[in-house]
Amino acid sequence: MKRTVFPLAVAAALTLTACETILNNLPGVYSIDIEQGNMIDQAMVDQLRPNMSKRQVLYIMGSPMLTDTFHERRWDYLYSDQPGGEARVQKRISLFFDGDNLIGVQGDFRPSKLPVIKESTETTVDVPKRNLDKTMWEKITGLFSNDDSGEMPVKPESKPSDLLNE
């Protein structure tokens, strides 16, 4: 009996490991989203224009995923997304430079020929001017005065000539 159980257990283990794709698709099993590389979208690529400097391209696109030491004129951006165990989607774009200026774009994205119109997210709020009868200081000092008018008492100014006459 022991001699037949061991080969059956080994055969069952080998058979189950071959069913990895079946085990990945079991209902109720959570699979994480896997994103790798530079996140690239069409809005970023639409901002690229010929003769842009490398610094401007870095500001728009971020650091390239690959900079080949043998092809310094070429920057490669790769993005891979595999949401929840589904099929992997990979996008790439290569930018070509002549010296410091952008001369070409190649890959899954193409810049549009329309100018980029950026919608403003700023809003202006008009706050109406408040009509204050009294300042805070006038209100505080008005609590201690006997005057019903609420005005602050004014100290008469003494002139230097008045001091000499005394």
UniProtKB/Swiss-Prot annotation:
Chief localisation class: membrane
Covalent lipid adducts (S-diacylglycerol cysteine), residues: C19
A Gene Ontology BP annotation from the UniProt entry: Gram-negative-bacterium-type cell outer membrane assembly
Membrane topology: Lipid-anchor
Signal sequence segment: 1-18
UniProt region (Disordered), positions on chain: 143-166
GO MF annotation terms: protein-macromolecule adaptor activity
Subcellular location: Cell outer membrane
Annotated keywords: Cell outer membrane, Lipoprotein, Membrane, Palmitate, Signal
GO cellular component annotations of the record: Bam protein complex
Disulfide links within the chain: none
Superkingdom in the source lineage: Bacteria
Self-association state and partner proteins as the record states: Part of the Bam complex.
Family, as annotated: Belongs to the BamE family.
Protein name: Outer membrane protein assembly factor BamE
Species the sequence originates in: Methylomonas methanica (strain DSM 25384 / MC09)
